[in-house]
Amino acid sequence: MIKNAFLFLALILTALWTQFSISAERQVECWVVGVSDGDTLTCLLPTKKQFKVRLQEIDAPEKGQPFGKKAKQYLSLLVFKQNVTLSVSGYDRYQRILATVYLQEQNINLEMVKNGMAWVYPQFAKNPLYFQAQDFAQQQKIG
């Protein structure tokens, strides 16, 4: 009986540790297994745990909106089936992980804005590089 209770407690603690381990780490490496739209992707950890990632500081058109399909395709071209590093800042209201996505040294969030596939999310953007990239894309009439 005590052995079963100990095993049950160990399972609960393991489940809780897995749930919170992503937010506890600032940097997470994962494999991109899906792209929902121009600012959301699905990652797979080496432990086979999947989770949604929302690219922070930017916003992209949704599937049914103009350029929505193009934004999704561009993000897919950049990161689908790639190992990426997430710089995690927390969770959004839909419990997706908020992160800046890096492919090697390339800031993917910034690339989306620079190439006119996303715009700056002014309520949440802190990095001035995003605003500069958006100005550049608008001046060049990209996207």
Q: What do the predicted segments below correspond to?
A:
Residues 2-143:
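Small beta-barrel nucleic-acid-binding modules, primarily SNase/OB-fold domains
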